[in-house]
Amino acid sequence: YFTHKSSKTRNYSYYWDVENLVAHWVAYPLNDGLAGSGSRTDDWGLDPKLPRNMQPVLFRGFRGGYDRGHQLPSADRLTREANVQTFYGTNMTPQLGSLNQQGWASFEGDVRDWSRQFDTLYVVTGCMVEGSTKVAYDNDNKAVAVPTAYFKALLGYKKDLSIAASTAG
């Protein structure tokens, strides 16, 4: 797995699948200092942690009608440095536009809203590619597995409460 840091904090960590060219999971914290409705940089780039041939190249998006679906949403990172890292191909999966722009985007907003109830909400977003028979092609014509399912796991922390009380709800 790999971790991206900004100058002041750990941004996110992810577990990379070189064969399918997707992160099985991306883990990140949400709190007042990190999340909000930040402006998108749309600075699509290569992840400096991996060589070009081991990651999707997505300057122009996926071919075949798929959106570049963020696992760590761009809106969850306010600083330019942290936001740029959300546009690496290693944070993307091929998503149908209807899912990416509607249901999943709404769910991401719900998670941001829930994060306000805690000092920190720890989020793990992931995708499943087992059994996938579909691929999308990146700008270098590499095949990227299209996930068959997505998930989010959440853990809320409040410094004034016990662990059981922090995660209830």
What feature does the model see in each segment?
Residues Y1-G169:
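Domain-level detector for secreted/extracellular nuclease and nuclease-toxin modules, and
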